[in-house]
């Protein structure tokens, strides 16, 4: 199976990460909330806390070799 990275562990991201992992896939799950990372860590290959709104964070996560990257988060930018 392909290795996926799921960025954002809200309702959709968490469900996708756990479902794919239960099918035998390798999953890297990433969220800025340590609580969400802790909740999913037993179900996925790796769970990482990172703030994806910071520049260059994705490059430093070591996910450049995954087969699929899913971005499932919402950030409202107000000026």
Give the role of each language-model region.
Residues 1-79:
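Cytosolic regulatory regions of ion transport systems
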